[in-house]
Amino acid sequence: MRPALVATLAGGILLAACAEAGPAPQTAPGGKATLLPEDRLALPEFDLATYESLIVELRGTPVVVNVWGSWCPPCTVEAPDLATVSREFEGRVQFLGVDILDARAPARDFILRYDWQYPSVFDPTGAIRDGLGYVGQPITLLYDREGKLVFEWNGVITADLLRKEIRKVL
């Protein structure tokens, strides 16, 4: 991911998280920080135009976009696989989550529960999904280095299928 874009996404997430900062996180067994609800990640709100601009800006890097919701049972099924595959391709493929039709607190909890290390944006009305012409969720989209959509999957995606499709664009 381009350094400026990483800084923008990370800065937006961290700035919002720090704006509400309270006491320092408690360390849980295993060395992971347990954040109090008021200290958890804030998801930047996106719309279709911002999403499309982001895909253009990321040209040169393959991008996996996953449209999800914390309330979506199939999304919970695929969440661990997304975390695993995103780590396997870290530095070579940019992952981006798009949380739709959700409330911020459950969305933050979902991200923390599945230990996603990639950015996720907040689309409370589902405008991005609807604007792209999809129905239902989860949806996984893969864009090649030129920013062209080369693979789409509506429903639960497996780690094996996602790996196979990513390898085609590397």
Where in the sequence are the language-model features?
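C-type cytochrome heme c attachment motif
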Residues: 70-77, 139
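Soluble periplasmic/extracytoplasmic beta-strand elements of cell-envelope proteins
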Residues: 66, 97-99, 141, 152
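N-terminal targeting signals for export/organelle localization
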Residues: 1-48, 163
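Structural microenvironment flanking redox-active thiols in thiol-disulfide oxidoreductases
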Residues: 76-114, 124-131
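A short beta-strand-turn-helix
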Residues: 42-63
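A generic structural signal for alpha->beta connector loops
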Residues: 61, 92, 117-118
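Short pre-active-site segment immediately N-terminal to redox-active cysteine/selenocysteine motifs
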Residues: 61-63, 68-71
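Thiol/disulfide oxidoreductase modules built on the thioredoxin-like
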Residues: 109-117, 124-170
